[in-house]
Amino acid sequence: MTRAVAEDLASSLEPDYRILHVLTTGGLEDLMDAIKTARKSEVDLLIGVGGGKPLDITKILAAELGVRYVVVPTSASHDGIASPSVSFTLSREIEERFGRVIRVEAPTAILADTTIINRASPITFKSGFGDLVAKITAVRDWELAYKLRDEPYSEYAASMSLLSAKIAMDHAHEIRTRLEESTRILVKALIGSGVAMSIAGSSRPASGSEHMFSHALDILSSEAGVKPAPHGIQVAIGTIMMAYLQGQDWKMIKEKLIEAGVPTTAEEAGISPDMIVKALTIAHKIRERYTILGSSGLTLSAAEKLARVTGVIK
């Protein structure tokens, strides 16, 4: 579907603009080739069409070329649509491979056609909902870092991030139906989360211990040679457990996730119980970000107890 959308968009622009097509799988070699091709062609504006990886590639290309970019999302699976950041995994790969961090900007414009987005796989909607609910624990982690580590904190950005989560949770049942109006609600909330990150100047309003848990799962999945669960699904499961540690109403969060059709157990998400527990024990090491996990993290027994008491594993 993504390619068809991109081709339709290019056809509508070609009478007035010179179009350079760049198709990429999202690998680092493809990224470097795309940068070289774009530089030779004196590109003025980039248009990213697709889900998470194509939009991340567009952001990096725009940063490297020093040009503006527009995004055309074809799914509502994550809050990176409007954010001034790329996925943690891709950012880490680039830093390890090239020894530097690429700073990206938020898009100049977002063209989100809900008719197109509504055709995406049902799991993308569940993933997007899970990514939004995660703001509840992310903001609490941010508040904790502000109080204990004097980390910069924006009440405005935090409030906007929590509002995005609230909007999604208030419409959990409608979002599960995937009617076009509910898709519009989900997309607006995801964009709102991205704007909150732009205001804060970091991903703090949207990413805390629950995302670190998800990143840990990504690493363990890669090491085991298995495909990880969708980002928002992993984050949703992490949110349930981190909310428990934070003393928040984790049962209400779990109920809303279930109402939206989001997997809330390791079995439903296709993740092994052992991997869930292992990810909990290493999540605090994933990045330099203070959260409810503290600097020492969870012991193996504490991690297993947490996963069991919240019903994530049996």
Swiss-Prot record:
Substrate binds at D79, D131, H215. It is an enzyme of class 1 (oxidoreductase). Pathway: Membrane lipid metabolism; glycerophospholipid metabolism. The keyword Membrane does not apply. It is found in: Cytoplasm. Its cofactor is Zn(2+). NAD(+) binds at G52, K53, P54, L55, D56, T74, S75, A76, S77, S83. One of its GO terms (cellular component) is cytoplasm. Its EC number is 1.1.1.261. The keyword Cell inner membrane does not apply. Its main location: cytoplasm. GO terms for molecular function: glycerol-1-phosphate dehydrogenase (NAD+) activity; glycerol-1-phosphate dehydrogenase (NADP+) activity; metal ion binding. It holds the Pfam family Fe-ADH_2. Zn(2+) binds at D131, H211, H231. Coiled coil: none annotated. It catalyses: sn-glycerol 1-phosphate + NAD(+) = dihydroxyacetone phosphate + NADH + H(+); sn-glycerol 1-phosphate + NADP(+) = dihydroxyacetone phosphate + NADPH + H(+). It comes from the Archaea. Belongs to the glycerol-1-phosphate dehydrogenase family. HAMAP family: G1P_dehydrogenase_A (MF_00497_A). Catalyzes the NAD(P)H-dependent reduction of dihydroxyacetonephosphate (DHAP or glycerone phosphate) to glycerol 1-phosphate (G1P). The G1P thus generated is used as the glycerophosphate backbone of phospholipids in the cellular membranes of Archaea. This is Glycerol-1-phosphate dehydrogenase [NAD(P)+]. The gene is egsA.
